[in-house]
Each structure stands twice: as structure tokens, then as C-alpha cells.
Design a protein with these regions (language model features):
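Core beta-strand elements of the Rossmann-like FAD/NAD(P) dinucleotide-binding domain
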Residues: 12-14, 158-168
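Glycine-rich FAD pyrophosphate-binding loop
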Residues: 33-53
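Helical substrate-recognition/capping region of FAD-dependent monooxygenase/halogenase enzymes
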Residues: 2-15, 19, 35, 44, ...
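FAD/FMN-dependent oxidoreductases across multiple families
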Residues: 77, 247-311, 331-336, 344-346, ...
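N-terminal Rossmann-fold NAD(P) dinucleotide-binding loop
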Residues: 25-26
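Active-site-adjacent segment of FAD-dependent monooxygenases/related oxidoreductases
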Residues: 50-54, 58-128
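Conserved FAD-binding catalytic core of PHBH/FMO-like flavoproteins
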Residues: 125, 132, 168, 172-278
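A conserved short coil-to-beta-strand element within the FAD-binding core of flavoproteins
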Residues: 136-150
Length: 522
């Protein structure tokens, strides 16, 4: 790796050099910019992708977007999924109405489809409004670390190589991450034998009615996702390796018969078609010194469940506020040590779970076929008749169930809310106006929530520490969500509870802040 002459800290090109301008890198740049951190974001491609694979935007991602004023635009451009249908042997065998699956759990209680290519365009537009431009055709060549910065060499579009300095580098550069490879971090796992394909099509038929449709009758998987616009859908499917190997390159005509037979889809126009291989891997580490790995650079897995892009965005939000806290002198650098343990545990569970799910829906064994053809179609609609089953499914898929209870940053319990849990969402009606307890989270800062009445000691303490205190009049709905009356909840900038203390104690909050080296007055 190359060396560069040192400059004073204020002469760094950026605080954070972001390598990769997919959703993960773009969201990291958005959050950091909103938090007052200087970013430089580069990408070796000449333009954003146009044949995207990711489709689902989960509720937790929308909650993160709500914090930066982006959620409404995503919901407006996306399409809510009202119901899901299972097909067996060319006929619809089961239908389950989603409705407001997560009612009372999230301000976004539904499944949303918003293609990644359109998603990226929106993120890029928002960054441009904040004065941040993605540097295209710009590639990371190498980098090295000193005691207080990262020294990188970057190849510009004209082929020249220049030096760039930043406090930290974030590898958001995908499965073939240059950052990860430069750090010699292992990426263990495997590759699925199936070849995946995705197609943007215009058509008609019973599977083009705005619902989600999934065919289970073959070892080859097929799903139809509704998009904005009449008769426009995104097809995602697989072809077993032995079939794919018979052709040098898979084309639409090779799978069109399967699509028509599985769901009676009449395709009138194919806007685009592409194929890809899917790996299931998790990096051995998500951090080395001043370098961090996020998104596909850190973990890749089957697209079953629509979790991949959302997990990368979760990585970005988790790291963004920690970068900002350290760079602004409001936290010790050890705060960054919590990124890897908080995110790698979830990534490992997710890869294992999606691997099992994908194997179940594509296995050619007799047992797997019996489960797909008989058991799942019978059970699927029944599950949605039970409120608890619906709520658990929503919490799991929406990532609102993700927690950091095992983190060194998480302490205490009040009600059923533990330190490390996502702050429960509660709707609050005041003077006939519907509000919620997530509104204060738009400050992107530490804050204290109290549901009931705050003591004068707590009010004085929060005022002296420049710590926002939000007091909500107690209601039975708060208790049902797991909150405890008059308990203190210290909430992180990303909406997770750091400390849950049942005693309404300013001393408990003071002890937490001191113990974790947090200074909120700078």
C-alpha cells in the first residue's frame, strides 16, 4: 500500500471515505451528512444499476428513513403488498390477506415493494440536495492507516491516481469488496447451485393483480412482485444448476415457459432480464482498525425474505451515529468497538435462516416436495387467522424484532422492554391530533423518554446535560406495548433503548453516560 505525506487533521478530504454507492453506502452518506459529518463517496461504476435485484423495503428501514424525512417519498413511490398467494401445479392453492399486518407495532405496518434501482435514484437525489455528489468511475486502489487517519489512493475517471485522507473508511463495495480484500478478512460460506434470474415485465393474467405470488410446485423457485403501474411486475426465479449448464447463457426464452405454466402469466413485454449467482457468506470481521465493512461487503445470502438490502441499511444507521459521536468529540473512540458485535450476530443468524428457508423451497427431495405441495398451502392461510402469528411474522420479516440486548451498550429492563430493544412504537392522540413517540427521533440524538410524570430531578439533570427529555401522558396502550409507567428509557440516536430503568432515576442515566464515555454537551 502507498504512503502519503501527513496533513493537519482539518485538511482531511473527508471525515469518512465511503467506498460503494449502493443503498448501504448511500444511506450511510445520508445519515452522516445529516449528522454534520463530511463524507466522500466513490463508486467504480459509471452509473447506478438499472437491473436491480432487491425489492422489499421493510418497516424498520422505513422507520430509519422517517428519522431523516425520507419515508413518505419511498412509500409514495413504492407499492404496498395487500396479499400473498401460493401456486401449486399451475393453480392458485392458497391466499392470505396481509392488510395492516403490523398494526400497532410500527407506523409502517405493511410490506412495501420498491425496486432497488428506483430506490437508489431517490437516495442520490436526496444526497444531491444536501450537497453531496457521488464520484463515479472512481476506484479505490489501496489504503493504509496511521494513528489518526486513513491514507487512500484513488483512481479517477481519467486514469490518474490521487491521494485521499479520511478519519475512517467504510467498505460498502459489495460481495467482491476491495476494502475487505485489502484487509485480508475471510469471507467463508458457499454458493447456491441454482442460477437466479430477475425480469421486469409488462403483462396480464391472474398473477398480475397487485398481490405477491409464489409458485411452490417445482424445485425451481418463482415469485411475482407487484410494481407501480398497471400490469407491471418483477419476476424473481431460479433454475437448477444442471439445467443452467446446458446453455452458455440463460435468456428469457429459456424460462418463459415455466413462468407461464406456473402462474399463467401472459408476458407482453420484457423490459429487461438478467441472471446472477447467489452466495451465502459472512465476513470473519466487520472492522479492522479504522476500516469497516457494511452490507454485501460483510454478508450476502439468499434473497428469500427480502432481508439483504435492509440489513445493509441497518448496518449503515448503526455505524453512522457512532462515527458522528466520536468525530464530534461526544464519545470515546471505543464506541466504534460496538459496531461489529451488534451487527455480526444478526448477520450470522440471518444467513443461516435464509439458507434453511431457501433450501426448503427449492429442495427436490420427496419430503421437501410434500411439505411444499401439501403442508404449506394448507397451513399458510390458517396462520394469518391468528393475531399472534401475524404479529410474530411481521416483527421477524420487518426487522422490528432485531435487538442488541447482548451489546455492551445495553443495560436494564423496565416493563418488558430491555436495554438493546427497539423503542416500542406508540400512537398518541393529543387534542384530536394523531402523533407518536417516534417523532422526537428525527433529532438523530440521544434522548430520554418517560411515559407518565417526570420528577423535577430528572428534568433538571436532562437540562444540565443537554439531553432532550420527552414526557408522554400515560395510556393503557403504552403498557400493552411493553413500556412501564414512570420508567426512564434512554434512547440512542438510532431508536434503540440503551438503558431501561424502572426507578425514574437521573442517577441511573448519569451513571450510564459516564460509564460509556458519552459527553452530550459538546
Amino acid at each position: 500500500m502507498s504512503t502519503c505525506s501527513l496533513k493537519p487533521p482539518d485538511s482531511r478530504d473527508s471525515d469518512v471515505l465511503i467506498v460503494g454507492a449502493g443503498p448501504t453506502g448511500l444511506v450511510l452518506a445520508l445519515w452522516l451528512t445529516r449528522l454534520g459529518v463530511r463524507v466522500r463517496i466513490i463508486d467504480k461504476t459509471s452509473e447506478p444499476g438499472t437491473t436491480s435485484r432487491a425489492l422489499a423495503v421493510q418497516a424498520r428501514t422505513l422507520e430509519f428513513y422517517q428519522q431523516i424525512g425520507l419515508a413518505d417519498a419511498v412509500v409514495e413511490r413504492g407499492r404496498k403488498v395487500i396479499a400473498a398467494n401460493l401456486w401449486v401445479r399451475g393453480d392458485k392453492s392458497a391466499r392470505a390477506v396481509f392488510g395492516e399486518l403490523g398494526e400497532g407495532i410500527s407506523p409502517f405496518p405493511y410490506a412495501l415493494v420498491f425496486p432497488q434501482d428506483e430506490h437508489e435514484k431517490l437516495l442520490i437525489q436526496r444526497l444531491a440536495q444536501l450537497g453531496v455528489t457521488i464520484e463515479r468511475d472512481t476506484e479505490l486502489v489501496s489504503f493504509e492507516e496511521t494513528a489518526d487517519r486513513v491514507l487512500a489512493r484513488i483512481k479517477l475517471p481519467d486514469g490518474t491516481t490521487v491521494a485521499s485522507e479520511a478519519a475512517y473508511i467504510a467498505g460498502c463495495d459489495g460481495a467482491h469488496s476491495t476494502v475487505r480484500q485489502a484487509l485480508n478478512i475471510g469471507f467463508p460460506g458457499g454458493i447456491y447451485t441454482h442460477l437466479f434470474y430477475v425480469a421486469d415485465v409488462q403483462g396480464s393474467g391472474p398473477a398480475m393483480n397487485g398481490d405477491l405470488h409464489v409458485a411452490l410446485d417445482r424445485a425451481d423457485f418463482l415469485a411475482v412482485f407487484p410494481l407501480k403501474g398497471e400490469g407491471r411486475v418483477r419476476l424473481v426465479g431460479t433454475v437448477r444448476d444442471e439445467a443452467a449448464r446446458e446453455r452458455d447463457k440463460l435468456e428469457w426464452n429459456d424460462v418463459s415457459k415455466t413462468v407461464m405454466e406456473s402462474m399463467r402469466v401472459k408476458v407482453e413485454r420484457v423490459n429487461w432480464f438478467s441472471t446472477y449467482r447467489v452466495h451465502h457468506r459472512v465476513a470473519d470481521r466487520f472492522r479492522h482498525g479504522r476500516a469497516f465493512l457494511l452490507g454485501d461487503a460483510a454478508h450476502i445470502h439468499s434473497p428469500v425474505g427480502g432481508q439483504g438490502m435492509n440489513t445493509g441499511i441497518g448496518d449503515a444507521v448503526n455505524l453512522a451515529w457512532k462515527f458522528a459521536s466520536v468525530l464530534h468529540g461526544r464519545a470515546d473512540a471505543s464506541l466504534l468497538d460496538t459496531f461489529e458485535p451488534e451487527r455480526i450476530a444478526f448477520a450470522r443468524r440471518l444467513v443461516a435462516t435464509t439458507d434453511q428457508a431457501f433450501t426448503a423451497v427449492t429442495s427436490p427431495t420427496l419430503t421437501a416436495r410434500l411439505i411444499r405441495l401439501d403442508f404449506v398451502p394448507a397451513l399458510f392461510p390458517l396462520l394469518f387467522k391468528f393475531k399472534q402469528a401475524r404479529r410474530y411474522l411481521f416483527r421477524t420479516v420487518s426487522q422490528t424484532l432485531v435487538n442488541y440486548r447482548g451489546s455492551s451498550l445495553s443495560e436494564g429492563r423496565a416493563g418488558s422492554v430491555h436495554g438493546g430493544d427497539r423503542l416500542p412504537w406508540v400512537k398518541i392522540t393529543t387534542s384530536g391530533t394523531d402523533r407518536d413517540n417516534f417523532e422526537p427521533l428525527t433529532s438523530l440524538d440521544w434522548q430520554v423518554h418517560l411515559y407518565g410524570q417526570a420528577t423535577s430531578d430528572l428534568q433538571t439533570f436532562c437540562s444540565q446535560r443537554n439531553l432532550s427529555l420527552h414526557v408522554f401522558r400515560w395510556s393503557p396502550e403504552m403498557g400493552r406495548s411493553g413500556l412501564q409507567e414512570n420508567a426512564v428509557y434512554l434512547v440512542r440516536p438510532d431508536g434503540y433503548v440503551a438503558l431501561a430503568d424502572p426507578t425514574d432515576s437521573a442517577a441511573a442515566v448519569a451513571s450510564y453516560l459516564e460509564g460509556h464515555g458519552l459527553t452530550l454537551t459538546k
